[in-house]
Each structure stands twice: as C-alpha cells, then as structure tokens.
C-alpha cells in the first residue's frame, strides 16, 4: 500500500469514524502489499480483510470478486484502496459493496488517478474526480440510494489518489457532517 493511500484512509477514519463506538469494517482488496489498511483501522472496529487469493492480511478469500460471501447490510464500514483499478468489472464490485453495507454505513473508495501500470493480476482503470458521481448514479440505477459525501484527488505523486466517500442511504447523510477535504465537490 503506497503512503498516500495509508494517509488518506487514516484521515477517513479520523473524520468519519472517530465518534463511532465500533462495528465491522470490510476491506476489499486487503492483501498486504507494502502495508495494510488494518494498520490505520481504529481498534474499536472488527476488521475483516477480503481478497480473491489467500495471502497476508486476508481473512476471507473470495471465489468471485463480484459476489461477496456476506449477508445484506453486514458491514458498518467498507473500505477499498488500490483495488478497483484491478477489477475488470468494477461496477459489479461496487454493487456488492452497496449490498453488504448497512443503511447508515460508509463506503470509502481510493483508486489511483495516475501512475504506472501495475498488474495484480490486471490493471484496467484509473478514476478521476467525477468517478464518485458516476458510482452514485450507477448505484441509484441498480436500486440503491447512495450519496457521495465527498470526493477529491490527492496531490501526492505518482498515484494522485482519487478518493470518494459515500453513505449507503441518502437519508442518513446528516450523521456525517464533517469532511476530510473542505473543497466543494
């Protein structure tokens, strides 16, 4: 995990989860490659690392990256960093993320907007600032009601992380008044 990805996720937890008493955090794409988001997940949360191969920091191995072995609304928070660029059909993964998060739950997405090719096992995508809006629209089209709380592009090279934070149900946005980045969407 590159340093800016760790820093951005740590900021997410500090801003959005600091007042939460605990719950379950699912980390999609959790394999420890030079670090893991487990390191920045607050101790009051039960962290579950999820990936499609058995490796360091993987608690649950997926049979398919597009079908998660969790009940509907099982997680309080879902995080994914440096993962969706490796998903050939990230829009299917996105819908599974929405399915497994509680209505008051949060989804944190971090995908490079730039950077060199890095296949694990493939490298298909880069996200730009408007990717969060597109994910919100795709979720609504599929029958969910997510709200993009914030989106920004990190200035640190070489990845210039594209970060987006969502609440699963639009009606619950008032639970999360604070933001990592105070710039407007």
Where are these regions (language model features)?
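Beta-hairpin (beta-strand-turn-beta-strand) motif
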Residues: 63, 83, 112-114
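Conserved N-terminal segment of class I S-adenosyl-L-methionine
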Residues: 1-73, 77, 163, 174-185
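A short SAM/SAH-binding and catalytic strip from SAM-dependent methyltransferases
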Residues: 76-88
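Charge-dense, low-complexity intrinsically disordered segments
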Residues: 3, 84, 126
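Generic anion/oxyanion-binding catalytic loop in active/binding sites
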Residues: 64, 79-82, 121
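S-adenosyl-L-methionine-dependent methyltransferase catalytic module, highlighting the catalytic core
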Residues: 88-185
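Redox-cofactor binding/interface segments in oxidoreductases and associated redox assembly factors
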Residues: 27, 80, 109
């Amino acid at each position: 995990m590159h340093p800016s990805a760790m820093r951005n996720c740590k900021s997410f937890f500090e801003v959005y989860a600091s007042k939460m008493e605990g719950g379950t955090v699912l980390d999609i794409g959790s394999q420890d490659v030079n670090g893991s988001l487990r390191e920045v997940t607050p101790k009051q949360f039960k962290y579950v690392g999820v990936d499609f191969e058995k490796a360091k920091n993987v608690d649950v191995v997926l049979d398919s990256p597009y079908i998660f072995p969790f009940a509907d609304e099982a997680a309080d928070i879902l995080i994914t960093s440096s993962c969706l660029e490796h998903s050939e059909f990230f829009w299917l993964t996105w819908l599974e993320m929405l399915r497994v998060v509680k209505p008051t739950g949060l989804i944190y997405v971090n995908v490079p907007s730039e950077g060199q090719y890095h296949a694990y096992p493939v490298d298909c995508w880069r996200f730009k600032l408007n990717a969060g809006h597109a994910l919100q629209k795709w979720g609504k089209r599929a029958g969910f009601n997510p709200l993009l709380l914030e989106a920004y592009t990190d200035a640190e090279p070489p990845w210039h992380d594209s970060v987006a934070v969502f609440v699963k149900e639009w009606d619950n946005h008032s639970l999360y008044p604070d933001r990592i980045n105070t710039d407007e969407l």
